[in-house]
Amino acid sequence: MATSVGDGKNTRWNELCKITKIVLEVGTIFDSNGVDLFFLNRPASLRIKNARDVDKAFVSAPSGYTPLAAALRYIIRLPAAKRGNDKKLLLFIATDGEPTDEEGNPDLPEFENVMYNERNPETTHVMFLICTDEPGCVEYFAKWDRTMKNVDVTDDFRTERATIRQYRGCDYPFSLGDYVIKALIGAVDPTIDALNEPIEVNDD
């Protein structure tokens, strides 16, 4: 995803990498066991415990297809995602396109099946960090944000701020720090999750 943002010197993919690295770095502070980073087309980096290791993991540029269903299925079958584990799993999925299978064929129904029917929403919270303008992708991510329990979707900073101000008012304060907080806990805190959604009106 090479779409330019802001002053044109940055791309949405670079922004996504930056926010993902921030999320990982914060995660290493709050989880003494470290955080696990799974890539779709190369080996995982497990038990990352400091910012230097985060930087090393992102040296190689992304390549290949987007087999999200297979990757998610593998992760939610790990012991950390099982009911009864002493900690819940907060899963961040950073993506810039439509899910495919390992051969590159569109695979959205299978990914949706894993999210709805195989993921346990009580033990596995999912935070999507996306950078795409494809109408189909935007539509199904927005639907999942509204209908799936313990799931939140966050776009790049400028798009997210514009969406929030569309519903909350043009002067609604939303800084880069607020963006990082939403990216971190949107799938855990319903109030944060709802920031980029229409305000519900109670007719009572």
Residue ranges and their predicted role:
Residues 98-154:
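VWA/integrin I-like adhesion module and closely mimicked acidic/polar interface patches used
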Residues 134-204:
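P/S/T/G-enriched low-complexity
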Residues 1, 42-45, 96-100, 131-135, ...:
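Conserved beta-strand elements of beta-rich interaction domains across eukaryotes
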Residues 1-34:
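…and closely analogous acidic/polar surface helices at protein-protein or active-site interfaces
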Residues 45-47, 51-88, 99, 131-139:
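Von Willebrand factor
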Residues 13-20, 69-73, 104-115:
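Well-ordered, non-membrane alpha-helical segments in soluble/globular domains
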Residues 26-30, 76-87, 117-120:
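Surface-exposed acidic, glycine-flexible loop patches that form ligand/cofactor-binding
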Residues 3-8, 38, 49-56, 104-107, ...:
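Short coil/turn segments at secondary-structure boundaries
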